[in-house]
Amino acid sequence: MKKRFFTAWVLLILVAVSAWSQQAKYVFYFIGDGMGVNQVNGTEAYRAELEGRIGITPLLFTQFPFATMATTYSANSKITDSAAAGTALATGYKTKNSTLGLLPDLKTEVSSIAVKAQKAGARVGIATSVSIDHATPAAFYAHVPSRDSRYEIGKQLISAGFDFYAGSDFDRPTNRKAPEEGTLYEQSEKAGYTIVRGYKEYQKKARKADKIILFQSEEASKRDRGSIPYSIDREKGDLSLTEITRAGINFLSKDLSKGFFLMVEGGKIDYACHANDAATTFAEVEDFDNAIRVAYEFYEQHPDETLIVVTADHETGGIVLGTGKYDQNLQALKYQRMSVNKLSDKLNELRKKTDNKVTWEMAQQLLGEHFGLGNPLKLNKRQEERLRKAYDENFKDQEAAYDESMYQKDERLATVAKEIINEIAMVGWMSGSHSNGYVPVFSIGAGAEKFCHRADNTDLPKKIAEAAGWE
């Protein structure tokens, strides 16, 4: 009897060890740009308030079985930028701010986990909600001293030869100094890439494509080639991060025997945080979670061979959930129906429509309709005076007053409206830039247990390589 029990116990251990040590064949690496701990916590608390209760309503990825946090400092600064952080997350090496794929000497190239996957025979995809040559996606294929070398980064994207790319567009598709080289679109097609615009065109052309680049529509790029629209502003036909993720999985799954690596960046979380736009930030985090859900559905079909890792490159804005009182009113943000940038556009449209003869009553109506200010959100005297002063600055002269953040320029009245709804919601911001806060790390699947101790951002690609056998 004892012998049988011992044999059964040994078999149980062997089965457990076998499951525990299963290599990851399909790897998802989700990076929420600017998504610190409070961006995640704030989103979940906001969701709970919308349900009329105190607490949190969890996102999908925060329910993954393994969770930890990571440090983010760069080689030359306590506060990283996205290039240095992206390089750390992609290669496992620290570098200087603004640098991509190079050591701090700005000469020595370091390979990313995506390149290691490619060399191991896996199919590779790099995707983002901003331009495909932006810092985070570029860290997986480019080697340049300056993240601003967008055209050169685009050329290196092509030479990297990954199977799938997706983003809003190329930020700088031409080289004015060498027009004979042709555009990056032409160079991509010459290298064997099929370029598609929008998810519907992807569905039509993906099956016959050997390698593919998915961009938003040309019309959308004319409005803003630097990113797809915020989820809170999304209209019918706009490309979404969920569609991008679904396309990536679909394309890389053409030959599942090879396995794959797919990095997906939620790039517009960072944009919203730079603008200190709480409602838009929480909407972007939730949209990021929706994209992760698509990968999770794949995981459910291949649980023993799939690894999903979710993290961030840094925190942006120094968001504070509480501004003095022992309370919050996050539910007020539900009345903000568009980003501050979109509200700025609405004000500009009103100016053009009225030949700059916008009355205070017209402005009030717009603020109430799109931000709920005045109705249903009651304003105190100081808040009303701030809005009226911003209105005067905006419409008394022919030239409107603007406020600039990292990625957008907003009319003063829109900026003040955003500040007031943040105030009503009791959300504070310390800056319009990055901070040195920890970033969260969540994981599930084959090798996920490797991500259960406090880490540095350089540890993550090393652990992924170990889990997948791509060392």
Residue ranges with predicted function:
Residues A8-S18:
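Bacterial N-terminal signal peptides
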Residues M1-W9:
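Bacterial N-terminal signal peptides that target proteins for export
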Residues K25-Y26, M35-N41, A45-T87, H134-E471:
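A post-motif C-terminal structural segment
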Residues Y93-F162, D169:
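Extracytoplasmic mature domains of secreted/periplasmic and thylakoid-lumen proteins
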Residues A19-Q23:
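Boundary at the C-terminal end of the N-terminal hydrophobic targeting segment
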